[in-house]
Regions:
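C-terminal folded domains that constitute the principal catalytic or ligand-binding module
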Residues: 129-221
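Cysteine protease catalytic domains with a Cys-His-Asp triad
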Residues: 1-129, 160, 166, 207-228
Length: 228
């Protein structure tokens, strides 16, 4: 969580924790018939290796059973990708057969993550091969989707907040809040810290609360001594 300190670049594990939150909320809301999938950064890592050799990874880490659901119910898929020290959101529209690359540090019309997008789509084809065959028309494939790079994505005001922007986009928050003058990096980072600490997934919550209580009591005691 130290990477959530002001001015720090976000590590992938912070994004992965948020993906677990979003996945859990979606599964509860849809009774395990998730319409939106939130895949974590390990999908990006596998795609950067060998896109065709992923089934063993998916099986060993129970990736598909947690982060995915029946393909027949899926409408869109969020994938955080990193083509090199920069987090980008890949939004796969399953019904529209369109991929949008949401890049908060865009130069020109093409995102630096476009090449990696093709690899991720190939991974999805490999992992979901059986479901695609049974639920989609003949010849249907993720790798055939058209790719777009929206030009209206709010741009980060610095070099280190791409991960914070990516999380906000995947949370489907109002993107106007990311525009210049409304986005406050330190406030957003504090929000994410609080979200992680208060989460039911936080196994060290009681330890953290006890530590915070001791710190508060010590500070309060020091103030009383100083007044005396």
């Amino acid at each position: 969580m130290l990477c959530l300190k002001p001015g720090c670049w976000l590590e992938g594990e912070v994004i992965n924790v948020i993906m677990e939150f979003l996945t859990d909320c979606e599964r509860i809301a849809t009774r395990n018939k998730a319409q939106t999938w939130y895949l974590n950064t390990r999908m990006n890592s596998e795609a950067m290796g060998n896109p065709l050799d992923v089934k063993d990874f998916i099986r060993r880490h129970r990736y598909q059973s947690f982060f995915m659901g029946p393909l027949v119910h899926c409408c869109k898929i969020y994938v955080p990708i990193n083509p090199g020290k920069h987090w980008i959101v890949m939004l796969v529209g399953v019904d529209d057969e369109v991929v949008e690359i949401w890049d908060s540090y865009l130069y020109g019309a093409k995102s630096t993550g476009e090449d990696l997008v093709y690899d991720v789509l190939t991974v999805l084809d490999a992992v979901l091969k059986d479901e695609i065959a049974s639920t989609k028309p003949s010849g249907w494939s993720f790798s055939k989707f058209s790719i777009r790079t929206p030009q209206n994505v709010p741009q980060q005001p610095n070099l280190y907040d791409c991960g914070v922007f990516a999380i906000n986009i995947m949370e489907s928050r109002d993107i106007l809040e990311l525009t210049l003058g409304k986005f406050h990096s330190e406030d957003e980072r504090a929000r994410l810290v609080l979200k992680m600490v208060m989460s039911k997934f936080n196994r060290k919550q009681n330890t953290l609360f006890a530590s915070a209580r001791r710190h508060h009591e010590m500070r309060s005691g020091n103030r009383i001594c100083n007044r005396a």
